[in-house]
């Protein structure tokens, strides 16, 4: 599901029910989320926004997922329709799946329910193969460094900080020093935070009236890059690679050993290679 992250869209709703959340760069230095719901649902999720071409690269590794969004520019929609993704454009549906909560205004007022969507399209997609490997302990032999926080300055709009909380064994999400909380007051957190460095470039398509070009990234055609995996209060330096659209992304240590995740929810930060990520130890 495509969820907005523009400052006016905050606080969001329903993200804590997602199994995996991808944060992707889009035009103008802002980011958006692709939230994966499989094990759990949410009665309200949003606000839901438009698709981007990068979403196909993110979601192709999940087989034939149901991709919920609110429209997009025509070249992107054409690419989605010719991809393995099952398109679910909320603009084509009535209030049976679309919610417009009081106090929200366009374009930040389109919400939905995973329950309602699954009820309508229960046979549209099938459970994908796992995209991560899991273990309750840090992989034996992996070179690790204790970490207190990781800072990801996407832009002045999104200066993301994750801080490790030993009590809950999770990383808590902040914007600078301000907790990133949802509409119910719960702070976003994750058992695993993956920083996946990607080469981004600007495509030929205008995304908005101010001239913002579509942000593109190669996530699957013999793609590879640096990765940082944070779990259990440690940092694991490694690499990521992916050969085809249908293949899950592989995360390995610098020596080639598979990096496993802590059982629980995972946030994947798709970070442009020019962004300087820092950690405190």
Residue positions per predicted region:
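A surface/extracellular/periplasmic glyco- and lipid-processing/surface-interacting theme
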Residues: 3-22, 27-281
């Amino acid at each position: 599901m495509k969820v907005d992250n523009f400052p006016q869209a905050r606080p969001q709703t329903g993200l804590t029910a997602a199994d995996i959340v991808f944060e992707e760069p889009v035009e103008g230095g802002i980011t958006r989320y692709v939230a994966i719901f499989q094990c759990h649902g949410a009665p309200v999720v949003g606000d839901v926004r438009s698709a981007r071409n990068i979403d196909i690269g993110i979601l192709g590794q999940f087989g034939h997922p149901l991709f919920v969004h609110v429209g997009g520019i025509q070249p992107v929609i054409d690419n989605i329709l010719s991809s393995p993704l099952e398109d679910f454009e909320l603009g084509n549906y009535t209030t049976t799946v679309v919610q417009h909560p009081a106090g929200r205004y366009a374009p930040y007022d389109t919400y939905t329910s995973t329950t309602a969507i699954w009820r309508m399209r229960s046979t549209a997609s099938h459970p994908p193969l796992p995209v991560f490997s899991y273990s309750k302990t840090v992989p034996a032999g992996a070179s690790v460094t204790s970490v207190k926080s990781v800072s990801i300055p996407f832009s002045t709009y999104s200066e993301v900080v994750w801080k490790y909380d030993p009590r809950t064994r999770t990383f808590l999400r902040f914007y600078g020093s301000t907790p990133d909380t949802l509409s119910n007051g719960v702070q976003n957190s994750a058992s695993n935070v993956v920083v996946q460095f990607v080469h981004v470039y600007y495509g030929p398509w205008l995304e908005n009236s101010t001239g913002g070009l579509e942000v593109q990234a190669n996530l699957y055609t013999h793609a590879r890059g640096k990765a940082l995996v944070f779990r259990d209060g440690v940092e694991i330096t490694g690499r990521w690679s992916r050969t085809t659209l249908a293949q899950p992304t592989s995360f390995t240590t610098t020596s080639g050993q598979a990096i496993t995740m802590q059982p629980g929810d995972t946030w994947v930060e798709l970070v442009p290679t020019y962004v300087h990520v820092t950690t405190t130890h």
